[in-house]
C-alpha cells in the first residue's frame, strides 16, 4: 500500500495562527515502505507472498461510559473465560486465520503480563488511572488488531525477560501490520471514489489504529538492538493518522486524546536525536487545550529548540548563519525551561501521589528532564557558546538527581532520554561513563527492551571518538541506516 488515508492534514506545526491545512496524497511512512499490497498479497517486506488476513468486522464496542468506568483488572480473563459473546467473535476469526494463535491459557498469561509488567512502562507515573490498563487493554477484547499487537509485545517482552525466545511475537506483529494496511487500503479506496475522510474513519477505528501503532512501535524496541528504524515506521504512520484526523471531527474521544498526547511525547523526544529532512515536519505537539497535562509546556519548548537547531544547521551549511539570528538567548532558554518545570509540578497534582518515594522521585524526574533539556539546548542550539559554569552546573545536577533516585526500577521508563543526554556530557569522565553504562544496562534488562543496548553502544562509540560531537555521530549513524532514538 503506497498511501495512507489518501489525504493528510498538513497542520503546520499546529500553532495558533497557522495557515489552513492543505490536503494531498501522502505516502504512508509506516506501512508503505515496509509493505505494499497487490490484490491482497504482500509483494515486499516481512509478509512477502502472503495474503492479507481477512478478519470480520469486530462488534461494536461498549459505550464510552462503560469504558470510562473500567478499572485496572486484577486478573485479565481469557476470551473463553469471559461470557461476553462479543469477545468470542473477535477471537474466533483470529484463530481461523492466524496459525498458532495462542490458546486461552496462554492468552490469559500474556494479557496479565501486559497488565502487570508493560502498561506501567508506558506512562510517566504508574497509577490506578493508567489508561493503558483502564481503557486500552479492555479495548483489545473488541479489536483483533490491537489484541494481536498487545499479545505480540507481551510475548516478546516475556521472551526477553525470561530468555525463552518464541516465533509467535514476530508473526503476530506481521499480521497486525497486515491488518492495519488492509484498513488503510480500504479507506484509500473509498477516498479515491470520492468519499471524505470524516465519513470513512469513525472514532472507534481511529482509536484502535492509533493504539495498535503505538503498541507496535514499542514492540520493535523490544525485539532487537536496531529496532529504531522499524519503530519509526509505526511512529510516522501514527503521526500521519493524527494529522489527517485533525481535519475531521473524528478525534474527540477521551481515549484518542490520551493516545494522541502519548504520541506527542514519543514524537517530540524522538525528533531530538534524528535528523532527516522531514523529522520535524508536522510533529504532533501537546494539544493546546491540554496544556495542563504533565510535561506539556516542557515538550512544546523542547520541540521549538529542536526546530531552531535544525534551522541553524541549514543556515550554517549554506554559510548564512549569524549568531544574532537565534530567536532566544541561553538566559531565555533557562527562564523558559524553569517556567515549564513549575508548570509540570503544578500539573502533577492530579496524580495525587502519596508523600513517599514515588512522589520524591517524580520531583527528581522533573529536575532530571529540566537539566537534560538545558544541556541539549546548549549543545544543539548554542553549540556551547554558553558560560562553562552553566554547562557544568546542569551536568552536575543531572548526575546527582539520577544517582539520588530512591526507586530506580519504577522510574526506568522515564530515563532513556535524559540518561542519553548525560552520556553525551561525560566524554572525558570515566567514572560518569561507567555510571551511564550501568544505567542503560539496567534500563535494557529491567524494561526488557533490547534496543537500549544499541544506544549504549552509540555512547561508547562517542566516548572513544573525542573529536566528534554527538549530533555529528548521530547523523553519521542515521546515514548508515541506524537511527538513534533514546525514548
Functional labels for PLM-detected ranges:
Residues 96-99, 128, 135, 139, ...:
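Cytosolic regulatory protein-protein interaction regions
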Residues 103-104, 137-145, 201, 475:
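Short secondary-structure boundary/capping segments within folded domains
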Residues 1-129, 169-170, 186-190, 461-486:
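Charge-rich, intrinsically disordered regulatory segments
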Residues 114, 133-139, 149-162, 172-227, ...:
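Hydrophobic/aromatic-rich effector regions of fungal transcription factors
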Residues 181-194, 245-262, 298-306, 347-350, ...:
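Charged/polar, low-hydrophobicity segments characteristic of intrinsically disordered regions
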Residues 204, 212-311, 481-482, 487:
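Acidic/serine-rich, low-complexity amphipathic helices located in mid- to C-terminal regulatory regions
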Amino acid at each position: 500500500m503506497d498511501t495512507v488515508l489518501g489525504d493528510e492534514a498538513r497542520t503546520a506545526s499546529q500553532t495558533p495562527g497557522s495557515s489552513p491545512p492543505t490536503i494531498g496524497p501522502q505516502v504512508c511512512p509506516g506501512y508503505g515502505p515496509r509493505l505494499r499490497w497487490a490484490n491482497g498479497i504482500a509483494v515486499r517486506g516481512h509478509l512477502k507472498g502472503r495474503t492479507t488476513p481477512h478478519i470480520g468486522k469486530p462488534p461494536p464496542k461498549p459505550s464510552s461510559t462503560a469504558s470510562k468506568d473500567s478499572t485496572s483488572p486484577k486478573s485479565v480473563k481469557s476470551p473463553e473465560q469471559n461470557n461476553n459473546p462479543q469477545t468470542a467473535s473477535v477471537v474466533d476469526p483470529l484463530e481461523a486465520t492466524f496459525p498458532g494463535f495462542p490458546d486461552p491459557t496462554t492468552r490469559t498469561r500474556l494479557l496479565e503480563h501486559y497488565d502487570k509488567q508493560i502498561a506501567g512502562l508506558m506512562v510517566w507515573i504508574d497509577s490506578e488511572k493508567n489508561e493503558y490498563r483502564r481503557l486500552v487493554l479492555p479495548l483489545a477484547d473488541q479489536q483483533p488488531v490491537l489484541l494481536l499487537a498487545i499479545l505480540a509485545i507481551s510475548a516478546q517482552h516475556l521472551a526477553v525477560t525470561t530468555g525463552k525466545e518464541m516465533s509467535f511475537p514476530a508473526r503476530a506483529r506481521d499480521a497486525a501490520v497486515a491488518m492495519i494496511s488492509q484498513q488503510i487500503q480500504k479507506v484509500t479506496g473509498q477516498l479515491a471514489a470520492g468519499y471524505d475522510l470524516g465519513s470513512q474513519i469513525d472514532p472507534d477505528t481511529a482509536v484502535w489504529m492509533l493504539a495498535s501503532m503505538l503498541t507496535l512501535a514499542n514492540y520493535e524496541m523490544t525485539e532487537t538492538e536496531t529496532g529504531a528504524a522499524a519503530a519509526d515506521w509505526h511512529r510516522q504512520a501514527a503521526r500521519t493518522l493524527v494529522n489527517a484526523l485533525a481535519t475531521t471531527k473524528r478525534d474527540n474521544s477521551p481515549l484518542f486524546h490520551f493516545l494522541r498526547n502519548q504520541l506527542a511525547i514519543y514524537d517530540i523526544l524522538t525528533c531530538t536525536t534524528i535528523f532527516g529532512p522531514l523529522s520535524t515536519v508536522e510533529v504532533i505537539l501537546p494539544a493546546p487545550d491540554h496544556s495542563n497535562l504533565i510535561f506539556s509546556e516542557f515538550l512544546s519548548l523542547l520541540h521549538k529548540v529542536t526546530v531552531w537547531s535544525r534551522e541553524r544547521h541549514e543556515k550554517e551549511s549554506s554559510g548564512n548563519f549569524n549568531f544574532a539570528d537565534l530567536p532566544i538567548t541561553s538566559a531565555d532558554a533557562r527562564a523558559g525551561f524553569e517556567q515549564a518545570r513549575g508548570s509540570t509540578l503544578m500539573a502533577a497534582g492530579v496524580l495525587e501521589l502519596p508523600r513517599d518515594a514515588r512522589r520524591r522521585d517524580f520531583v527528581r524526574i522533573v529536575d532530571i528532564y529540566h537539566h537534560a533539556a538545558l544541556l541539549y539546548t546548549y549543545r544543539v542550539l548554542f553549540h556551547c557558546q554558553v558560560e562553562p559554569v552553566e554547562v557544568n552546573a546542569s551536568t552536575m545536577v543531572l548526575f546527582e538527581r539520577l544517582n539520588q533516585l530512591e526507586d530506580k526500577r519504577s522510574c526506568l521508563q522515564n530515563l532513556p532520554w535524559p540518561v542519553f543526554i548525560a552520556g553525551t556530557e561525560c566524554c572525558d569522565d570515566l567514572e560518569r561513563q561507567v555510571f551511564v553504562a550501568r544505567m542503560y544496562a539496567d534500563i535494557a534488562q529491567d524494561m526488557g527492551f533490547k534496543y537500549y543496548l544499541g544506544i549504549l553502544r552509540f555512547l561508547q562509540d562517542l566516548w572513544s571518538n573525542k573529536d566528534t560531537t554527538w549530533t555529528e555521530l548521530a547523523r553519521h549513524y542515521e546515514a548508515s541506516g541506524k537511527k538513534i532514538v533514546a525514548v
